[in-house]
């Protein structure tokens, strides 16, 4: 019979929310610094905004549209900042609360914004445009003043050409009524704001890139596109005081070398009188192999600091926020294309500060991710212990504290541990602690060291990423780790606290090759053109503490062919088995005795139900390995000796581009050659119940088939899980880890197997515990099948014309549910085992993850549509490897090549998220402005302030034309609320539709059950 199970879930239990973002901001474009709050803001090409403070203070927000950030200006010590974007908008952000929000915006309709400038303690923002005009925006009301500086009034009347875009705006430090305007062509204008006219004009010899004032207000420096610096005086001289080409040398012809542009320059002084001139670029063109650089000029000393990546922007960190006094610089923040570095200006040699943020996530491209929530509590200390011992402390860093010390870190974290594993293209695996709002690296495992370097060639002639990690399977309790690499190998690692010296066992598993529709078994033999893509280091090797290689399974490859990709991987430490599947079949390895116990080809998996009517040709089990260093204790633990029955479940995806598969694949694709393959997409270990039987041992000679029951679903299988009779996840068995260095003197005993995730059934459930459910989820639908009757008790069509990218059965609030990420960008959740819809929310467009698309196009125009479809499908598989769901409703995905984005589907965790987020704004007193001496004030050479409200206000200057810009007062929080309301409404409509279909499905299932048992006697039931 079918027992109807109550669902503990409701729609209020599940709520999708993005939580924390970690890594380096992808494609940065601008940077700014608040010297009082000591916060750093970085804008990106995609509209993201990261605000960084002390370690643990890291906030991410994003503009509504994917528009690049041009420039950022802090409202010093006010808890706000202004951003200018490429859609010609100016946004005011408020970060006095934990989650920054847009307060107001204004979008220019007829002008293109090129630069902005906000004077200290001013509410009027200066906006320069591509047409050469300057506007004034009130950041409190976002009203544009009628005071406008037009380009034709700023230049000389005799000038016949347009001066170009405004590239720089800055006030005179001592006279705020004088505005220095820098145009792209090199035209400089000192504008008198009170008199509304140009006080003086200069023309630089080369196009202009940036300007920086001396704090005395009497001179300034300009940087140019020819790599030169020009120094100017405000004493109405038409020529520069000096022209300096810092990196130009005289060649053999007696001429100066041509140099690259100096993109930005800053002129900063210490109170002692020493001056720093800091700029980026300016190196000679003909210097081969010259790296991007930052140059620091201190007096006659010139220091060139080479960078690993292109310099995007930099900002000098100063103690003094007042620009009319010596700013006292102490550090320089340099934003590179793929890194963030901070230079110590006060230490000889200008060493770097050691970066406390996880900015090296993309040190090697991320190829796969695994997320483990609620893992054993002793795992993080163990990883950190071996990681700290294995990594030598880097030298050459500044001994001073990290200069970005703003905000307050929240010590609140989850009551359970979270670990993230990232696999990389160079074969490394990084272990991260993600328990709190921050991300800290624990340990780095380099799998490429297991192989010989001189044999790391690809058999198809390419050398691209032979060690790239494609799949990761970790048993946290036993601390056994399986890694599948790009060169068709699988590695098993065991965790040990101490260094060891041993030999790594190697198994060469035979493969299948398909010729003219017939499968042949190939073993490497003399004269055959076979080979191994990689070769394991032979002999006894010294292995550092941590995960040490224990077993490597290799697959031989035909020369000129690509290695067969590993498509599924799983390990069960309790059984002592490791299983992996590829495009040709499946292999099961006894990891205790280091032998292949099962090697089955795809035809044998079908058995008599093979739709292609092929002759099964599977290899015999390989001979036991010659590795003799297995302990006696481990041998007695071998699953070959234990009487343990294993329920093995897998799915074969046949012809990934066939019309029977998902993603609207064309049926004509099956006529293309060399694209038909069958790959094991998913496999799982599970216990079956055998206690209510009587076992008789007979020796029968029968024809043996590997196959069992076959369940066919539309689309490839993505995940499977097993539920007990009460609908709870069946506990998976594991072997507890033990410290071999501590227990090696003890008497060997058989290790006890434990279980995790839920308690074993007892009491009243004992009679019903021989029943269980298997949940099978494909790219199109989900089914719940009762075992051992194999009746489909629940089914759900997840999508029609789209497909599921990633799905997982997770535990959430003492129950389980199915969570799926759909290709339409939506996240859907269903209760188990009833598959009742819980939520259907718009989450993330799949196009936002298209940066992982690396496949080239097809030249043949007749195949362009098919080929593009094929590559999209393969890239979707790569996206699925970096998209993870975990227990407790946690999840993450690779949102850019350099960043990880965490999210949650738990409403309970979403409610407590605010407590885990750090405070960005912390009240500080504004530093007192430097006092002027009596004689400076007497002779009128002190600071001249400006009443900007009187000058730019509506009463004196009026408002600009309404057609000039559009005011947008709505905050981002309001927009987010509207989006949530729309998603909630769509979810309610979907739930109502499902409630209509549920009675029909139940009626159909009941009718089918009645027909099945209608004509059977009572003893046949």
Residue ranges and their predicted role:
Residues 46-49, 87-90, 131-134, 185-188, ...:
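Short coil/turn segments within WD40 beta-propeller repeats
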Residues 37-41, 59, 78-82, 102, ...:
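Structural hallmark of WD40 beta-propellers
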Residues 23-32, 67-74, 110-118, 155-172, ...:
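Canonical WD40 repeat/beta-propeller blade segments in eukaryotic WD-repeat proteins
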Residues 319-322, 342, 363-376, 382, ...:
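Intrinsically disordered, low-complexity regions in large eukaryotic scaffold subunits
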């Amino acid at each position: 019979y079918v027992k109807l199970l109550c669902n503990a879930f409701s729609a209020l239990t599940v709520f999708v929310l993005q939580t924390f973002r970690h890594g380096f901001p992808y494609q940065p474009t601008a940077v700014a610094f608040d010297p009082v709050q000591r916060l750093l803001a970085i804008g990106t090409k995609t509209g993201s905004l990261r605000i960084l403070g002390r370690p643990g203070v890291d906030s991410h927000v994003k503009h509504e549209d994917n528009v690049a950030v041009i420039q950022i200006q802090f409202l010093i010590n006010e808890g706000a900042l202004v951003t200018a974007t490429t859609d010609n908008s100016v946004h005011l952000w408020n970060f006095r609360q934990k989650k920054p929000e847009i307060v107001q915006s204004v979008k220019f309709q007829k002008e293109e914004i090129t630069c902005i400038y906000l004077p200290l303690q001013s509410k009027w923002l200066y906006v320069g445009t591509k047409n050469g005009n300057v506007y004034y925006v009130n950041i409190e009301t976002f009203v544009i003043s009628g005071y406008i500086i037009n380009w034709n009034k700023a230049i000389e009347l005799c000038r016949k050409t347009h001066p170009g875009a405004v590239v720089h705006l800055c006030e005179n430090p001592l006279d705020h009524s004088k505005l220095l305007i820098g145009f792209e062509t090199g035209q400089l204008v000192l504008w008198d704001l009170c008199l509304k006219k140009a006080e003086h004009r200069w023309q630089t010899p080369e196009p202009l890139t940036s300007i920086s004032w001396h704090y005395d207000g009497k001179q300034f420096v300009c940087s140019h596109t020819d790599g030169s610096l020009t120094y100017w005086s405000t004493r109405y001289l038409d020529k520069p005081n000096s022209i300096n080409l810092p990196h130009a040398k005289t060649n053999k012809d007696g001429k100066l070398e041509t140099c690259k542009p100096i993109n930005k320059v800053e002129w900063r002084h210490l109170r002692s009188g020493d001056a720093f001139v800091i700029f980026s670029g300016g190196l000679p063109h003909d210097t081969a192999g010259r790296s991007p650089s930052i140059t620091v000029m201190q007096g006659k000393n010139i220091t060139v600091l080479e960078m690993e990546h292109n310099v995007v922007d930099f900002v000098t960190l100063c103690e003094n926020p007042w620009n009319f006094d010596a700013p006292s610089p102490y550090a320089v923040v340099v934003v590179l294309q793929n890194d963030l570095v901070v230079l110590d200006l006060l230490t000889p040699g200008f060493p770097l500060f050691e970066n406390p943020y996880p900015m090296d996530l993309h040190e090697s491209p991320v190829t796969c991710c695994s997320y483990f929530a609620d893992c054993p509590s002793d795992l993080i200390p163990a990883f950190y212990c071996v990681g700290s011992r294995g990594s030598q402390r880097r030298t050459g860093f500044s001994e001073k504290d990290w200069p970005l010390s703003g905000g307050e870190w929240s010590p609140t974290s989850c009551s359970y541990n979270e670990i993230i594993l990232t696999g990389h293209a160079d074969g490394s695996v990084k272990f991260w602690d993600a328990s709190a709002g921050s991300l800290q690296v624990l340990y780095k495992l380099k799998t490429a060291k297991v192989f010989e370097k001189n044999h790391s060639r690809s058999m198809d002639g390419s050398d691209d990423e032979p060690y790239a990690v494609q799949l990761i399977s970790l048993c946290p309790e036993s601390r056994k780790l399986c890694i599948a690499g790009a060169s068709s190998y699988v590695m098993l690692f065991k965790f040990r606290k101490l260094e060891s010296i041993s030999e790594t066992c190697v198994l060469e598993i035979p493969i299948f090759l398909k010729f003219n529709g017939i499968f042949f078994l190939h073993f490497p033999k003399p004269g055959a053109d076979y080979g191994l893509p990689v070769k394991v280091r032979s002999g006894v090797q010294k292995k550092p503490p941590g995960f040490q290689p224990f077993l490597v399974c290799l697959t031989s490859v035909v020369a000129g062919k690509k290695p067969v990709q590993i498509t599924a991987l799983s390990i069960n430490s309790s059984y002592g088995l490791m299983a992996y599947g590829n495009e040709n079949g499946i292999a099961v390895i006894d990891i205790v005795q280091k032998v292949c116990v099962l090697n089955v080809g795809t035809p044998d998996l079908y058995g008599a139900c093979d739709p292609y009517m092929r002759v099964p040709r599977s290899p015999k089990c390989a001979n036991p390995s010659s590795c003799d260093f297995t302990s006696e204790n481990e041998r007695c633990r071998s699953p070959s000796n234990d009487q343990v029955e294993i329920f093995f479940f897998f799915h074969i995806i046949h012809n990934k581009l066939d019309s029977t598969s998902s993603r609207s694949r064309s049926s004509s694709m099956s006529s293309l050659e060399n694209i038909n393959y069958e790959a094991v997409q998913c496999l799982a270990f599970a216990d079956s119940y055998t206690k209510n039987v009587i076992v008789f041992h007979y020796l029968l000679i029968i024809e043996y088939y590997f196959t069992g029951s076959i369940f066919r679903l539309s689309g490839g299988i993505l995940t499977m899980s097993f539920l007990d009779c009460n609908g709870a996840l069946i506990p998976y068995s594991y072997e507890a880890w033990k410290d071999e260095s501590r227990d090696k003197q003890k008497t060997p005993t058989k290790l006890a197997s434990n279980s995790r995730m839920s308690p074993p059934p007892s009491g009243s459930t004992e009679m019903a515990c021989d029943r269980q459910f298997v949940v099978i989820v494909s790219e199109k639908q989900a089914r719940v099948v009762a075992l051992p009757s194999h009746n489909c008790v629940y089914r759900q069509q997840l999508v029609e014309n789209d497909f599921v990218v990633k799905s997982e059965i997770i535990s959430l609030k003492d129950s389980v549910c199915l969570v799926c990420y759909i290709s339409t960008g939506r996240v859907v959740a269903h209760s188990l085992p009833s598959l009742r819809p819980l939520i259907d929310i718009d989450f993330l467009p799949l196009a936002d993850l298209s940066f992982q698309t690396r496949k080239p196009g097809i030249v043949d125009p007749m195949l362009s549509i098919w080929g593009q479809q094929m590559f999209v499908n393969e890239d979707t598989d790569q996206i699925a490897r970096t998209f993870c769901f975990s227990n407790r409703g946690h999840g993450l995905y690779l949102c850019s090549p350099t960043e990880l984005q965490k999210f949650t589907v738990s409403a309970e965790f979403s409610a407590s998220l605010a407590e885990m987020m750090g405070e960005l704004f912390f009240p500080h007193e504004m530093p007192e402005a430097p006092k002027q001496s009596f004689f400076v004030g007497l002779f009128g050479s002190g600071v001249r302030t400006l009443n900007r409200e009187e000058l730019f206000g509506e009463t004196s200057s009026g408002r600009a034309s309404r057609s000039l810009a559009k005011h947008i007062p709505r905050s981002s929080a309001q927009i987010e609320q509207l989006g949530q309301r729309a998603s909630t409404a769509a979810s309610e409509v979907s739930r109502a539709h499902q409630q209509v279909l549920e009675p029909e499905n139940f009626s159909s299932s009941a009718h089918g059950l009645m027909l099945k048992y209608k004509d059977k006697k009572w003893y046949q039931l």
